[in-house]
From Swiss-Prot:
Pathway: Amino-acid biosynthesis; L-arginine biosynthesis; N(2)-acetyl-L-ornithine from L-glutamate: step 1/4. Transmembrane segments: none annotated. It catalyses: L-glutamate + acetyl-CoA = N-acetyl-L-glutamate + CoA + H(+). It is an enzyme of class 2 (transferase). Its main location: cytoplasm. In bacteria which possess the bifunctional enzyme ornithine acetyltransferase/N-acetylglutamate synthase (ArgJ), ArgA fulfills an anaplerotic role. This is Amino-acid acetyltransferase. It comes from the Bacteria. It is found in: Cytoplasm. Residues 289-429 form the N-acetyltransferase domain. It holds the Pfam family AA_kinase.
Amino acid sequence: MRNTELVQWFRQSTPYVNMHREKTFVIMLDGNAIAHPNFINITNDISLLHSLGIKLVIVFGARCQIDELLAKNQMSSTYHKHIRITDSKTLEVVKQAVGGLHYDIFSRLSLRLPNSPVLNVVSSNAVLAQPLGVIDGVDYGLSGKIRRINIEAIQQQLAQDAIVVIGPIAPSVTGEMFNLPFEEIATQIAIKLKADKLIGFCDQQGILDSEGNVLSDLHPREAKRYLTQFIESGQYHHSAARFLQAAIEACHAGIKRSHLLSYKEDGSLLQELFSRDGIGTQLSEESSENIRLATSFDIPGLLNLIRPLEEQGILVKRSREQLEMEISNYTIIERDGIVIACAALNHYPQEKMAEMACVAVHPDYRDSSRGDVLLEAIKRRAYKLQVEKLFVLTTRTTQWFQERGFVLSTTDDLPKEKREHYNYQRMSKILILDLGQ
């Protein structure tokens, strides 16, 4: 990364640093993620999150390590409904695998980065288990499910600035140990903690569409369709499918956002959390984008958006004072709290006309439909004001407006006040849309 790119990335990430501080994230790591060479980078990034004031719970699984140890001991496993049936001999292997991963995670997180403090990493026995029992005539043995979670104990550890690590085995009230699906543990802890995010590291960069492109945002309703595809194609064993199911459940239970990332790509955690569009798949009941009327708090974001366009001569220069006086005229699109598009509606009630002005879209989003979204929002505001004609003055985007029904006009068609202040040096094209009211 060149110095200029580093500076730009660091500046763009600053709002997210402030946004995430003091928030609680639950991170799911399966055995494949821990075994991968990139795991050391993942733990370094987790340490960085902790240094930024983020509260972290790590829940890990050990399926691939368990399978390797079973094969080494010439043992095999039986599954029913994607759950391992655990007998007493298998449980000994499970405990061995989980213990080894516990050590690996603690040792990696204990590696100090230069000029950084030693992390307080703790193991938690906050999960109490109970047997799954007999289902469909199948005895699951020592495979279990959650009976209770001592969420207060986890909260106390987080309050003491600790990273909490929890594995996939837990005791019962009778003292027996049970093998639990770690995705279930992570999901339920996130729900009971009222965590801000559930993050899963899986074997691909989120959820992919039919052409192999990453879906950056998914509503749980859409996510269910992809989960069904995983199941019907016999791919539920993939971590992406299991994590997707966990994310859907978490979203339905009130977790605002869940993220699916690849454990294979260096820096995926940081790119997902500290950039506008991320790198993996985000699940949310609500869109990360919001269109609304601007307030005075949006002025710094508006200035950042329109200043480059003013310097290029695309927009007329506006002072901060002018924006403050006219802020109620503006409609904005924000993404993760950052203004990425705007437009103003200046009303001329005597002529029943209005101007769509100061139309700006962030460069990263100009190939999308944000301009159309803004236009529709401005038209809705105009209808409420009983505006009959909407006009724009533009030097660069004449065709775009013509494609949407605007017709080239002259200064004679402008409201009197606007006509008197028309800038003949800029020679902006005048286009008018008949709203048919």
